[in-house]
From Swiss-Prot:
The keyword Kinase does not apply. It comes from the Eukaryota. The gene is CML33. Keywords: Calcium, Metal-binding, Repeat. The lineage of its organism: Eukaryota, Viridiplantae, Streptophyta, Embryophyta, Tracheophyta. This is Probable calcium-binding protein CML33. Potential calcium sensor.
Length: 137
C-alpha cells in the first residue's frame, strides 16, 4: 500500500498528531483497512485496546490490533487490503474517491456523509490528489 508501514498508517489516522488515536480515528482507520469488520467488533476491539480507559489507543496497541486482524483473516493482510480496495474502487480506475467510499460505506450500512468520507480520504491520501491508491492492485 504505497509501501506504508503500520506506523505510517497510524500516523495518517492520528489526525490530532498526539501519538494516540481516538475512537473516531480508530474506527476510520480500521474501516478503511478492513471494511468487512462489523461495527460491534470494532467497539469490542477498541475497548480491549483501551486498557486504561482514556479513550485513546497508542501506536503499539494499534499494531497489536492489526496483528490480531491479520491472524483472524488467515494472516494474509495484503490480500485482504487488496480485496477491500477493489470493493471500494467502483469504477475500477485504480483509485478510490470520497464519493466511491461514501457509496460503498452506505451500502455496507454505515451512516456517513460525503464530507466525512472526504476527511477519511484526505487522512490517507499520500500525494494529496484527493484519491486513495493501492500500488500493485
Amino acid at each position: 500500500m504505497n509501501n506504508m508501514s503500520l506506523s505510517d498508517i497510524f500516523e495518517r489516522f492520528d489526525t490530532s498528531k498526539d501519538g494516540k488515536i481516538s475512537w473516531e480515528e480508530f474506527r476510520d482507520a480500521i474501516h478503511a483497512l478492513s471494511p468487512s469488520i462489523p461495527s460491534e467488533k470494532l467497539v469490542e476491539m477498541f475497548i480491549q485496546l483501551d486498557t486504561n480507559g482514556d479513550g485513546q489507543v497508542d501506536a503499539a496497541k494499534f499494531a497489536s490490533c492489526m496483528d490480531q486482524t491479520a491472524q483472524s483473516s488467515g494472516g494474509d493482510v495484503e490480500k485482504e487490503l487488496k480485496d477491500a480496495f477493489k470493493l471500494y474502487d467502483i469504477n475500477c480506475d485504480g483509485k478510490i474517491s470520497a464519493n466511491e467510499l461514501h457509496v460503498v460505506m452506505t451500502r455496507l450500512g454505515e451512516k456517513c456523509t460525503v464530507e466525512s468520507c472526504v476527511g477519511m480520504v484526505q487522512a490517507i491520501d499520500v500525494d494529496g490528489d484527493g484519491y486513495i491508491r493501492f500500488v500493485g492492485v
